[in-house]
Amino acid sequence: MKIGVFVPIGNNGWLISTHAPQYMPTFELNKAIVQKAEHYHFDFALSMIKLRGFGGKTEFWDHNLESFTLMAGLAAVTSKIQIYATAATLTLPPAIVARMASTIDSISGGRFGVNLVTGWQKPEYDQMGMWPGDDYFASRYDYLTEYVQVLRDLWGTGRSDFKGDYFTMNDCRVSPRPSQPMKVICAGQSDAGMAFSAQHADYNFCFGKGVNTPTAFAPTAARMIQAAEKTGRDVGSYVLFMVIADETDEAARAKWEHYKAGADEEALAWLTEQSQKDTRSGSDTNVRQMADPTSAVNINMGTLVGSYASIARMLDEVASVPGTDGVLLTFDDFLAGIDAFGERIQPLMRCRDHIAPVTREVA
């Protein structure tokens, strides 16, 4: 099973709590995180894109770097780890994304890929006059299908004459082309999102579910298998989890309860409000899960809380779920968390027994 890190491109990572570590996103922080991840043989690093935050006492995600420029910088200071940036497709023409991706492919020596998102939070785009109207909620995967077709044309042949409802290419050119086939990933949990991934993506990201229920996402992975069977393609699931680890289960649980007790209710209310704006996509979208009050303090990603041995055992359970190709990890404290993962958790994982133990780097 592959291991990735979801780098904190926005302030405070993924904990919407006044009791969680409070920090701003910087290149130096993300550089340290990704270089540590590479040192411990993580397979990939991904950054999201967020153009407007949730506010509240913690100003959650009000402060964000930009994904492509951040990952270009990280590509230049790493040598092995795969690097993925996220394209907010409403804001960037596909021909520009194709050229930026080809550039970062050159910087990274073929280690780059693109995560495509349709956009769900209207204020991110409305503030720039770029929101196409609420009907977009129902047509966004039609838009994305045309978008990825243009990308594949340009990466594959260097030329596109695509004509569609959303994009018109007139002998559009991109050169140089990527040195390797460009990986495209998506994060679809709705039926439309999974159908898109089955047809066009190399991997599909999905949320883990619950606290210390590592296989609860299995029905989602099964749906992805079924969707991919219809297209005859192999599209594995990468599952998002937060790791909160300590020496003992009790110590880790105490941290988790402390974070929950400091939940930023104002920011969470904003998330809930935005999640209700999409009345066209059904009840199975990522944002609906994010706003569920069960564990909203970390946007309801799957959460693994326990001792280092307990975390290793639960991650092995994740790996046992059919269709699972990898996990995308966040941490309550990224730098300490990645060290703990590399030194204390990964060596105990059966699904990572091909990785030689690594000690902490000497500063």
Swiss-Prot record:
Keyword vocabulary terms for this entry: Flavoprotein, FMN, Monooxygenase, NADP, Oxidoreductase
Pfam families associated with the record: Bac_luciferase (PF00296)
Residues given in the record as FMN binding sites: 49-50, 115, 124, 140-141, 190
E.C. number: 1.14.99.46
The keyword NADP is annotated on this UniProt entry: yes
Molecular function terms, GO-annotated: alkanesulfonate monooxygenase activity; uracil oxygenase activity
InterPro entries in alphabetical order: Luciferase-like_dom, Luciferase-like_sf, Pyrimidine_monooxygenase_RutA, SsuD_RutA_monooxygenase
Reaction(s) this enzyme catalyzes, per UniProt: uracil + FMNH2 + NADH + O2 = (Z)-3-ureidoacrylate + FMN + NAD(+) + H2O + H(+); thymine + FMNH2 + NADH + O2 = (Z)-2-methylureidoacrylate + FMN + NAD(+) + H2O + H(+)
SUPFAM superfamilies linked: Bacterial luciferase-like (SSF51679)
One Gene Ontology biological process: alkanesulfonate catabolic process
Domain of life: Bacteria
Family affiliation: Belongs to the NtaA/SnaA/DszA monooxygenase family. RutA subfamily.
Function according to Swiss-Prot or TrEMBL: The FMN-N(5)-oxide reacts spontaneously with NADH to produce FMN. Requires the flavin reductase RutF to regenerate FMN in vivo.
Name of the protein this chain belongs to: Pyrimidine monooxygenase RutA
